[in-house]
């Protein structure tokens, strides 16, 4: 038996190491000597070397020797060696190494000198033919030293505290942006002027020329994708100077088309077709140049060739349809041009035909959720501007269907500006809006904003007659500004759109995005919340609210809502008006005169109510009553106003007025919980308990969510005499948020009324048998707070002694222990000493008993000793002196 104990380690070990979890007993000479596991020895050696369990040099050395004997080539035996230096070698070895390095350096220099490309440092007179690396901050080589000197000469002096108080963040940021734009423009121009259009290819092989041409073409592609078409043209020219290819000509033609250099683009397309006849891209781009040069027949020929090769080419089909339409419209114009007469476009006013009507879609912003926003169909009704044009006015001029700003050919080219002004004057707001929508969809936001501005300028004098149309135009122009990054212009247009059409969703969303871009998160939060009030299904607004909530919590802390601007109240009819518009009839007025006062009264009512609620929160009850009085003048059937005013009367002690308001509220809504509860408080304040209309039990039955009524019901039951046979029925009360139409209830709203009867509530505690540990803990905590020894003794009588450790759980405190001992001594020792003995026995088995016993003072232990003395004096058949003495030892007395 003893041998087995020696072979096996004891049950209680000394733990393990942090690394490898090796038992501490294995870090021993005897174990290492007998161990033949190489992996185990390597782990032990690693732990010993780390020193996490202490430093034992002799044990470490012994482990190394043991591991050397078992595995001489083990990795654990390897030791780190520092990098070799000159002192690590002999003089001969170091001289040989040094000579080898020098010979290698000289050989590399000779190899560089034999290369074809010259070294600019050795030949300063010869310029480097290769362009510099592309970048916004590239500058001449000669200016590097001067710039570095100027930078080192400047010293930045830190600002003092008084200057920081006057620091305007937005102004400084705008200055930085302006400086950055100016520097960027200057650097780009300087960079373009330094790029040479030709590459010296003398002496290069075809492979090297191909490599240089592809490299320059790649640079041109990068410049083209970034929108720098001038730079792209230069790099494509450099590529063509190295090796002419059809691809480079095609690419340069596309860049020239972007720059509207039609003749240069046409030449490049023809050269590409000379190198590769039938090239699809060259034919397409030559057709584009023909189209803009009004050579429609040539464009049709090229496009038909493309469609013969690729019948499914969508771009060719679309361009061909446009060219055919232009060709068809230009036929009468060509006849008129032969006569040499100019047709003046005039607009006929006061015509019976409303030719200016146009059904256009309000374009969508990319940031708006498509499913939630949708295209809102609006009819742009142009009054006194649209009319029937004469047949002469309907006859289009040459190139009338072209894009704005394109030059026209033929006899009309002598006065292009005059024609452009006439054409713009003839365009109706509907045409301008539709053209702006097309430009917006094509990504030309600045041009779209110009079109919307023209439509706004025509409709602005009409004022409120076209408020809806103006609101849409302002909203569209705001979307263009938002895309361009002009957030302040976007905010101004959205404000104007909301003045014309309050609570429109799109202006609110776009203004919120602009505020968020400017980091004005509080204003953005208010706009997003307003959008969600109108339509809670908009996912973009919901996600943005969650994101901005996290940002405001980090910035302002948990009280960030107090710093928000006031959130406007959305009328109940507003969502229906915005999202479900009725069928529009041009003959009817958009809003009759009779509806204006109703909307005004509703807004005024809501504003007065919110002001009153805010005054209640600020405890300014008299001013709140005046606000509620004004609300009742507008709407005398608002039940919430009566209950709110009753609350103010209760706070001011005017119980009679509060009772009258509650009666009126109950006449409107007989099941109103707050009115019933506040009527109860008013009647109790009047000491008229016999004439109560509603008691708290009825309130709880009406609304189980009313926490205050349930709490008052518990107080009432506590003060009532307890019934002997019937056990009380318990009601679960869960506290939830109140409705949004009234200000939230506060637990202290009846504090002024409850002061009068606080003495009645301080009666004896009714104790019943607890069902679980939670109820036992609640009752015992209440008894301990009141120091009620009689109630504690009654609770111990109801409690079985063997259940006491479970019911106490880990909630035993020092004052509870002393109260239990005192209640046993005062009320139970003389009546039932055996029950006291059992309670003392099981009390010693409760959690935290030993800790509480160690924390008791000397006086408290003397009181406990008196309990045991009384228990010894009591005569009980089941108690002996040995039992009481054993209990004394458990209580350390």
Swiss-Prot record:
Modified residues (Phosphoserine): 351, 703, 739-740, 758
Positions of GTP binding: 630-637
Sequence segments annotated as region (Disordered): 112-155, 324-344, 349-368, 373-437, 704-756
Positions with biased composition (Acidic residues): 734-744
Major localization class: cytoplasm
Tissue expression: Testis and sperm.
Any one GO MF annotation of this record: GTP binding
Any one GO cellular component localisation term in the record: dynein axonemal particle
Location in the cell: Cytoplasm; Dynein axonemal particle
Composition bias type Polar residues, residue spans: 403-415
InterPro entries in alphabetical order: CiliaryAsmbly_MitoImport (IPR051982), RPAP3-like_C (IPR025986), TPR-like_helical_dom_sf (IPR011990), TPR_rpt (IPR019734)
Pfam families: RPAP3_C (PF13877), TPR_1 (PF00515), TPR_8 (PF13181)
Record key words, sorted: Cytoplasm, Fertilization, GTP-binding, Hydrolase, Nucleotide-binding, Phosphoprotein, Repeat, TPR repeat
GO biological processes: axonemal dynein complex assembly; single fertilization
Keyword Kinase listed: no
PROSITE patterns according to UniProt: TPR (PS50005), TPR_REGION (PS50293)
Per-repeat ranges for TPR: 213-246, 247-279, 280-313, 429-463, 471-504, 506-538, 605-638, 639-672
Skewed-composition ranges (Basic and acidic residues): 112-126, 416-437, 708-733
SMART domains: TPR
Note from the entry: Antibodies against SPAG1 interfere with fertilization.
Annotated function: May play a role in the cytoplasmic assembly of the ciliary dynein arms. Binds GTP and has GTPase activity. Plays a role in fertilization.
UniProt name for this protein: Sperm-associated antigen 1
